Amino acid sequence: MRVKPQGLVVTSSAVCSSPDYLREPKYYPGGPPTPRPLLPTRPPASPPDKAFSTHAFSENPRPPPRRDPSTRRPPVLAKGDDPLPPRAARPVSQARCPTPVGDGSSSRRCWDNGRVNLRPVVQLIDIMKDLTRLSQDLQHSGVHLDCGGLRLSRPPAPPPGDLQYSFFSSPSLANSIRSPEERATPHAKSERPSHPLYEPEPEPRDSPQPGQGHSPGATAAATGLPPEPEPDSTDYSELADADILSELASLTCPEAQLLEAQALEPPSPEPEPQLLDPQPRFLDPQALEPLGEALELPPLQPLADPLGLPGLALQALDTLPDSLESQLLDPQALDPLPKLLDVPGRRLEPQQPLGHCPLAEPLRLDLCSPHGPPGPEGHPKYALRRTDRPKILCRRRKAGRGRKADAGPEGRLLPLPMPTGLVAALAEPPPPPPPPPPALPGPGPVSVPELKPESSQTPVVSTRKGKCRGVRRMVVKMAKIPVSLGRRNKTTYKVSSLSSSLSVEGKELGLRVSAEPTPLLKMKNNGRNVVVVFPPGEMPIILKRKRGRPPKNLLLGPGKPKEPAVVAAEAATVAAATMAMPEVKKRRRRKQKLASPQPSYAADANDSKAEYSDVLAKLAFLNRQSQCAGRCSPPRCWTPSEPESVHQAPDTQSISHFLHRVQGFRRRGGKAGGFGGRGGGHAAKSARCSFSDFFEGIGKKKKVVAVAAAGVGGPGLTELGHPRKRGRGEVDAVTGKPKRKRRSRKNGTLFPEQVPSGPGFGEAGAEWAGDKGGGWAPHHGHPGGQAGRNCGFQGTEARAFASTGLESGASGRGSYYSTGAPSGQTELSQERQNLFTGYFRSLLDSDDSSDLLDFALSASRPESRKASGTYAGPPTSALPAQRGLATFPSRGAKASPVAVGSSGAGADPSFQPVLSARQTFPPGRAASYGLTPAASDCRAAETFPKLVPPPSAMARSPTTHPPANTYLPQYGGYGAGQSVFAPTKPFTGQDCANSKDCSFAYGSGNSLPASPSSAHSAGYAPPPTGGPCLPPSKASFFSSSEGAPFSGSAPTPLRCDSRASTVSPGGYMVPKGTTASATSAASAASSSSSSFQPSPENCRQFAGASQWPFRQGYGGLDWASEAFSQLYNPSFDCHVSEPNVILDISNYTPQKVKQQTAVSETFSESSSDSTQFNQPVGGGGFRRANSEASSSEGQSSLSSLEKLMMDWNEASSAPGYNWNQSVLFQSSSKPGRGRRKKVDLFEASHLGFPTSASAAASGYPSKRSTGPRQPRGGRGGGACSAKKERGGAAAKAKFIPKPQPVNPLFQDSPDLGLDYYSGDSSMSPLPSQSRAFGVGERDPCDFIGPYSMNPSTPSDGTFGQGFHCDSPSLGAPELDGKHFPPLAHPPTVFDAGLQKAYSPTCSPTLGFKEELRPPPTKLAACEPLKHGLQGASLGHAAAAQAHLSCRDLPLGQPHYDSPSCKGTAYWYPPGSAARSPPYEGKVGTGLLADFLGRTEAACLSAPHLASPPATPKADKEPLEMARPPGPPRGPAAAAAGYGCPLLSDLTLSPVPRDSLLPLQDTAYRYPGFMPQAHPGLGGGPKSGFLGPMAEPHPEDTFTVTSL
């Protein structure tokens, strides 16, 4: 359509004849026809003469100035007609069309032109205004706008104006979007607009090839610039317009001429111009080209016609040499053009007689082919005009590049001889120089080159031509502006051009007519001389020169404008310059890439991919550093090196720069900082960044730091990171650490892009960067948050929590990090990343929260881990929860929630915002979208896709919801969906690439979903992205799923919220990304992590998706959690000594690379699951390797993912690859994967675990602790075993781990890991996501629950219910109210129902995670083991949650809500009580309480719920939970469901943490499934997001976690 409409537009514009217009109406029966018909009608109404008179006079009345100009034009035309029309125009006209007709056409054209000009006067302003409008339109529909804007706009506005703006918009847009092409396009566009402008004229102008009177006007009209210039100089400007038109024509024509000269066949030139025109016209020249031939050809003819053979032909002739040269320069364009020229030209030639007839012309319009032929001259003219043709676009760029060729022709136009010489020189291959003079006499049809040269000469001679020249000049300026200048400059340029033309028009008009304008023009073209002559217009050109063209232009400019003689030499120079210009153009193009981040995102993603090696190298470097620091003396090395890293981070952090590069870096950040191989380096870097950043609160560094720090540091960071490292943040957001590289890898472009996108876009990167660094924490606002960037996220969250007591004490933090366990999911990703990154991050985290780091890093490795882990966890959990919650609120509150979030943010600004976002989320399922991303990812993919798909897909773009931040929330939903993420992941896993791309592209980046998001991400992620658009969100969202949702969405809101959705979006994203990242957190985020991690990671990730790197690296809270998880796991898993971590780090690093891949996979998986489940499925061993690769590595990201998925499926067996199982397995396996990779490092597990944890952030940790850590085998076994065990033993372990073995194992982590895993697995079986969903997701669930739930109908209410406690806090009202009531009720239901649902649905939990889709089975299969026990309970919860998720989403969470509610309050509290007490009762509870108290509002619904109810409930739940992690799990399943079950499992010592984690995971994971679980989870996350909305959200998450 683009092509066609463009072609049509061009055609219509070009043809511009009544028939054409009529025809155009045919094509665009809408607006365009109206104006066109008017013009056409009028022109037809008036005889050609009358038309001429009318144009000159009748039309003049409309523009009195026009009359003058018209009069002048007629004189000019007369001149032109005498010299040019007689020679060229007439000959051409005659050759192609009867001269009489040509005359009539000219007259008519003039009349039309007058009309056009008339409109242009008004249009000028309109154009300027509309320019913006058009710009937007173009932006919205680059091509369509051309077509629609030109056509449609034209009808409303003078066609010229519309075209004009189409031109400007397009060029601007194009420039931004397609710099190189655009450069040509501007000319083309100018020309094209001319066509459209002329279109009205072409009617009459059809036959009047000469269109002498029309020549200037026609040229102006044809040029389309005239409308602008004309409007500008409409009054007296007829002449000026003519000049401008001439200029435009010159600009337009030069290439056309070049093309034609090269074509040397009139037909060829015509088609060539057509081609050129279409391309410029269509933003997508390539798409356009094919059509361009047919479409453009007709317009070409009309173009020639409107130009009035003389004007256009002359100009075209002038341009022809340039065009030829351009073609020579651009063989590609040349070749196609010649073909087009030959074929279309010939067609046109034969039809030219037809073209003569307006009707024929219209027909031609209809028939692209016939359209061209309508006027032999018209066609050539069009061709000239079309010179803009896409092909010429390049050419034009080249020729126009220096505008030397253009300048030559332009100048020549003024003093045509010079241009001719120049053109000749330029078109040396076809030697137009000689042809131009001969061509003048020569018939147009026979020898277009000759005719064109003739025309060129004629214009030189012709005063009228001079007018055209003025126009031409304008064109040059215009074209130049777009080409050289950015959109902004372009506008300025445009204005300048107009002003110049107007200002100089009086003087220069004469000069131009005289031919003196050439120097001016040349100056303008060259930029130098033009500057002298036209300071205004020139200035912009000069700017162009600045763009790198200056030297050449200057050289050309001075010589060329100075002497026609120089033209030859200059022509050579021009040719060289033109050729060089293309390079410059490329440069510009590059610039524009930078300039256009949005487009850049994809490019960046690609770039990232391309630079992956670079990134890897860098990462390797970083890894080495990280490894060294991490391995050697993480505390010592890291602390010292961290600052350097910070500095380095800034380098990297220049994510702006790096972003593109780092897409690898982003990825790397995600990976290095966030995850995997690079994770180490990046973690180091990220960590460093986050470390210093957090410390320094370097907002910018934060970007990188945000990537690393944010990943580690927290949502803010991550969010910051998001922007900072789009890829990185996004990756993290998506997958967390792998996200960056791995994800990018996995998702490949998507993730990186996504990541880039996410951070860049959603995070508002900068905003987040600042925010994250300082903003983030600031976002989080709590000083505490700021205190540790880690805290920033973590800090903010954790810090908020820390403030709460998390930070306050290691214990608190530990507990917090218990949440970290859930964070574990984040950890999954984060852990994976955190293996060392996390480890570093633990340092970092500690750094971030110096306290945390200190004890985390230094002293209490175990405690540190605990504290760290807890810290991370809570932040993660809380953050994630908050994130989800915050986002959720954001979603519902959207602005308000953000406000709420802000409010909450007050305490935990970020979190509150997150909460807001989260809470908001509930409001919109689309909010769910935010949630959905998580949910969608995991659950949404499954559930959301099913349920939320609408929101997911639709709100997917919740863009739909985006409006309300909704993406954020939506993403929150997705965040919740993060779980979905995981599930989606599976889809996405496969889809990953797609989705990643897609999703990512969406910025859903999410694509974390990318995997899940893919499905969703694609569906919802994009929306998230879109919503956030949220491209950032995309990135963030992608965070990726949520990140974006949060980030993008939330980022927007989130961003708004400091949690900026970092928490939510980022976090989620993180979960998503993080989860996706599989970066443990990513993975976790991805999976449940999608959910959970989404929560944690989400939170964190969202912290940034940017965070994910950090989060991953820094882990944000999540990451910290993850790191902590790792650390934390290690923390829990004391044996996960830092050394292990370090060791793991070494493993991790290389493996991290692999992990990266895995992480990518995880990214893919990130569905978290992908990796997570991959690993888990991988049977611990394979999975571990695979998963690890996947999770950690994201090795083949996709491949790995696939493999993992397959294996996972295999392992998953029933669940199949269901993410749930995957997560489940991932819990086992993934830990193995991440952890395994880290293999025995549980730290690895932790780190990886987070990766794993991602899968079972909570469970994972457990698993990781248990499995990998312990054995790595333990985890491996645990992972594998856990996987299986988890499958069976895990289920048992789940129960058993729930028993403390795992707990002991993980301490918390093991429990968490295993239990969590178990729980997670049960939930987590929601593959990593499940974990996220289940265990991991539990928080996500919880967290996400709010999201999911949030999104769900119950989302809000349910959400409230889920967060009933905190609900009140956050906005909890809904949540609270609903949830609360359900809460009470849910316990039973939750227990039974949820449990039940969970058991079967565990998958459901996962289901929405993705497992929900298949996972029920998966979960059932996988989870059943785990779920069997817990599965039943959890299963129920999961099922309920999942169902809720799935069904709840659709269902509206009522049911789920109940369970969730209960779960949340129920298990959540149990989590609090059981977990808190069991695990670090004090930490958990204390932390929780602290968290609670602190977050209390955060509510941590569960906390508050748990707090009062929590304790009781917690107690009860713990029992229940402990008793059957299943039931608790049921409760936890949703929120605590997983959390609870996990909690239950975790109820053991780690329960608090595990529970927390699981809960968090549940919240997180459940985010995916929490949508359903939301209520239950909602209790936690909801609570968090509800209560804390922002802070509570984080806290809530934490709370959920804690609880």
Swiss-Prot record:
Protein name: Transcription factor Gibbin
GO molecular function, one term: DNA-binding transcription factor activity
Underlying gene: AHDC1
Top-level lineage group: Eukaryota
Main localization of the protein described in the UniProt heading: nucleus
GO cellular component, one term: chromosome
Linked pathology: Xia-Gibbs syndrome: An autosomal dominant disorder characterized by intellectual disability, mild dysmorphism, hypotonia, delayed psychomotor development with absent or poor expressive language, hypoplasia of the corpus callosum, simplified gyral pattern, and delayed myelination.
Sites bearing Phosphoserine, chain numbering: S268, S596, S829, S846, S896, S1064, S1187, S1322, S1324, S1399, S1403, S1507, S1549
Annotated PANTHER family: TRANSCRIPTION FACTOR GIBBIN
InterPro entries documented for this protein: AHDC1 (IPR039225), DUF4683 (IPR032757)
Positions of region (Disordered): 19-108, 150-236, 264-285, 394-467, 581-607, 717-792, 806-827, 1159-1198, 1253-1286, 1503-1533
Reported function: Transcription factor required for the proper patterning of the epidermis, which plays a key role in early epithelial morphogenesis. Directly binds promoter and enhancer regions and acts by maintaining local enhancer-promoter chromatin architecture. Interacts with many sequence-specific zinc-finger transcription factors and methyl-CpG-binding proteins to regulate the expression of mesoderm genes that wire surface ectoderm stratification.
Basic and acidic residues bias locations: 179-194
Residue numbers carrying Phosphothreonine: T1401
Subcellular location: Nucleus; Chromosome
